[in-house]
């Protein structure tokens, strides 16, 4: 896997080199906006909504619309807010894994050890796993500092970026307290027990992506068939033209040739055979 970031993990005075690689991989078919007529990609131009002028990169700035006006923020001002050019996953504390609300968990990366840090890496992973702990770390990513958890996953360590606490909304609704009888609770517990099993993420495939891949593959196959049919048709027209020229030169009279049909085959029999074939195909897919 291609590394997104290279640096080190620091815990107190202990430090070892690592590299970050995304846990999630891009997969499936990607769709783009295209011109329906010729398939050309649609490009979006940068146009000012006030004057209608198309802008170049040098004309662009960042700004915040406060309602009373637009406040421009210059690149130099943003540079002062960005993370220092550190290359360290600085673990600042350890906490019980159960105290990290799953709502806070964001994108995840594998922490891959690099020599000579495999020993320290393995010790940290084992300590976290035995203690049911996660490390809370500050990490410079994509030009700004983020907070992340470092946790064991199987035989490796995973760094998972946390959403900022102030970005999490509390529910703005109240659920009325309902009094549940023992019978209802017992039935619910029985239902939940009957449906309880070990979670296997592979048992829940991405049906949309698989379906989209099939749609695109079928269309590509259809295009190939159409192209082959067109080539055969064009080749047949060329042969027919050559034969016509030869017939004209030798003055061979035209002969009407009746359309051929398989022996004993009638239009109704063919239709019935097609229906039976389709029913057999459908039955095989059930």
Curated annotation (Swiss-Prot):
Biased composition (Basic and acidic residues): 226-242
SUPFAM superfamilies: SPOC domain-like (SSF100939)
Region (Disordered): 226-270
Biological role: With LigD forms a non-homologous end joining (NHEJ) DNA repair enzyme, which repairs dsDNA breaks with reduced fidelity. Binds linear dsDNA with 5'- and 3'- overhangs but not closed circular dsDNA nor ssDNA. Recruits and stimulates the ligase activity of LigD.
Subunit: Homodimer. Interacts with LigD.
Family that this chain belongs to: Belongs to the prokaryotic Ku family.
Protein name, entry field: Non-homologous end joining protein Ku
Lineage: Bacteria, Bacillati, Actinomycetota, Actinomycetes, Pseudonocardiales
């Amino acid at each position: 896997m291609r590394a997104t970031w290279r640096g080190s993990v620091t815990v107190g005075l202990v430090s070892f080199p690592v590299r970050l690689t995304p846990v999630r991989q891009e997969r499936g078919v990607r769709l783009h906006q295209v011109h329906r007529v010729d398939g050309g990609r649609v490009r979006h131009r940068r146009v000012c909504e006030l004057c209608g002028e198309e802008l170049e990169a040098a004309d662009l700035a960042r700004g915040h619309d406060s309602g009373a006006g637009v406040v421009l923020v210059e690149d130099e001002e943003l540079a002062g807010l960005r993370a220092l050019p550190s290359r360290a996953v600085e673990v600042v504390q350890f906490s019980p894994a159960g105290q990290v609300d799953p709502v806070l968990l964001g994108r995840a990366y594998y922490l891959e050890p690099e020599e000579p840090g495999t020993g320290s890496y393995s010790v940290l992973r084992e300590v976290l796993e035995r203690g049911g702990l996660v490390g809370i770390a500050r990490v410079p990513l994509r030009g700004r500092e983020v907070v992340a958890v470092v946790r064991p996953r199987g035989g490796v360590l995973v760094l998972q970026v946390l959403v900022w606490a102030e970005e999490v909304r509390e529910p703005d609704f109240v659920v009325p307290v309902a009094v549940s009888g023992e019978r209802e609770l017992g039935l619910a517990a029985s239902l939940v027990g009957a449906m309880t099993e070990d979670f296997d993420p592979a048992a829940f495939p991405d049906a949309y992506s698989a379906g989209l891949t099939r749609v695109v593959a079928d269309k590509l196959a259809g295009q190939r068939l159409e192209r082959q049919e067109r080539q055969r048709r064009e080749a047949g027209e060329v042969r027919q033209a050559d034969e016509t020229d030869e017939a004209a030169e030798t003055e061979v009279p035209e002969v009407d040739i009746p359309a051929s049909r398989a022996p004993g085959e009638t239009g109704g029999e063919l239709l019935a055979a097609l229906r039976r074939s389709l029913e057999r195909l459908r039955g095989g897919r059930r």
